Amino acid sequence: MSNSASSFADVSSGCTAGTPVPADSPIRDNIADAVRRVRETTPLAQSFTNFVTINLVANAQLAAGGTAAMSFLPDDVIETAKIAGANYINVGTLLPFYKDALPEIAQRLNYLDKPWVLDPVAAGIGHTRTAILQTFKAAPPTMIRANASEVIALANMWGLNTETVGDASEHRPAGVESVDDVESATGAAVALAQYLTEQHAKHSSHDASTRCAVAVSGIADLVTDGETVYRLPGGSAMMTKITGAGCSLGGVAATYLAVSDPLTAALSASLLYNRAAEIADTTSHGPGSFQVAFLDALWNVTAEQVAESEILVQ
C-alpha cells in the first residue's frame, strides 16, 4: 500500500467507531451475491447524469459488470426504463428543460414501479436545482447517494431533518464538494431513508418490508436503511482528485439495485469502490493513472474481496 493509501486508511478507520459485522453475517453473503449476480447477468442500469462525468459513469457501470444506457429526453428515459433493471438521476449539470423533464421522469418511474437512485449534486445551490429536488419529495427515489452536505441540504429541503444545528443555509455544498463531515449527516440520512421507505410502502407493488437506503460518501462512508447505520472505512484520498468519483458511484449503485434490495445495493457499491480505490492507489502515480487503475480494479476485484471489507454497525 502506498503512503497516501495507508495514511487515508488510518484516518478512515480512526474516525469511525462501531461494532464489526461478523464474517459469517448474512449481510456479507448478500453483498457477495450481488457482486456475482451483476457479473453473471450484466443488468441494464439507465442514467440521466451530468455532462462532466457521463463517460466515467458509463465506464464504471461496465467495469462493475453491468450495462449502461445514457438518456435525457423524457420519452427516451421512460421507454428505456421499461427494460432497465434500475435507473439513476444526477442533477449535477442542468439545462432549462430539466425543470419540467426531471419531475415528469420521476413521476413516471414511480408510476411504473421502477427503482431509481438519486444523486442530489450541489443540493441547496440555485433556485432551479432546488425546485427540481423539491418535486422529488412527492415522487421519491428508492436510494439516495450523496455527500454529507447534500444529504443534510436535501433533508432540510424536504422538512425531514430535525437534528441539524443552526440554520439550514449553513449546511450547503461548496459546489459539488462537501463542507460537512459524514458523522454530521447521520440524522439526515436516517430521516431520508425512513421517509423513502414509508412512501414506497404506500405506493409500490414490491414487498412492503423492503427498506430504501441512503449512502453518504466521505472519509468513512455511511449507509443506512433508516433502522441500522453502517460505516465503511477504507478507500483512497485519490478519489477526491478525479472528476466523477461520486457520480459514477451513484451509477454503480443503480447497477446493483437492478439485482438486489436497496440496502445491499448501497453497501455493495460503496464497498466495491473502497476496495477498488485501495488497489488502484498501490499502482498509480497520479490522478490520470489512478483513474485507469481504478476502472481495472472495479473489473478485477472479487466478490469475496468486496464482501470481506470492513463494515461497522454504528
Swiss-Prot record:
Keyword Phosphoprotein attributed: no
Gene Ontology molecular function: ATP binding; hydroxyethylthiazole kinase activity; magnesium ion binding
InterPro entries linked: Hyethyz_kinase (IPR000417), Ribokinase-like (IPR029056)
Keyword Transcription regulation applies: no
Keywords: ATP-binding, Kinase, Magnesium, Metal-binding, Nucleotide-binding, Thiamine biosynthesis, Transferase
Enzyme class: transferase
Needed co-factor(s): Mg(2+)
Ranges annotated as biased composition (Low complexity): 1-13
Gene Ontology biological process terms in this record: thiamine biosynthetic process; thiamine diphosphate biosynthetic process
EC code(s) of this entry: 2.7.1.50
Pathway(s) it belongs to: Cofactor biosynthesis; thiamine diphosphate biosynthesis; 4-methyl-5-(2-phosphoethyl)-thiazole from 5-(2-hydroxyethyl)-4-methylthiazole: step 1/1
Ranges annotated as spanning the membrane: none
Catalysed reaction, written as an equation: 5-(2-hydroxyethyl)-4-methylthiazole + ATP = 4-methyl-5-(2-phosphooxyethyl)-thiazole + ADP + H(+)
Residue positions binding ATP: R145, S217
Residues annotated as binding substrate: M70, G244
Stretch list, region Disordered: 1-24
Job of this protein: Catalyzes the phosphorylation of the hydroxyl group of 4-methyl-5-beta-hydroxyethylthiazole (THZ).
Family the entry assigns: Belongs to the Thz kinase family.
Protein name, as recorded: Hydroxyethylthiazole kinase
Originating organism: Bifidobacterium longum subsp. infantis (strain ATCC 15697 / DSM 20088 / JCM 1222 / NCTC 11817 / S12)
Protein's gene: thiM
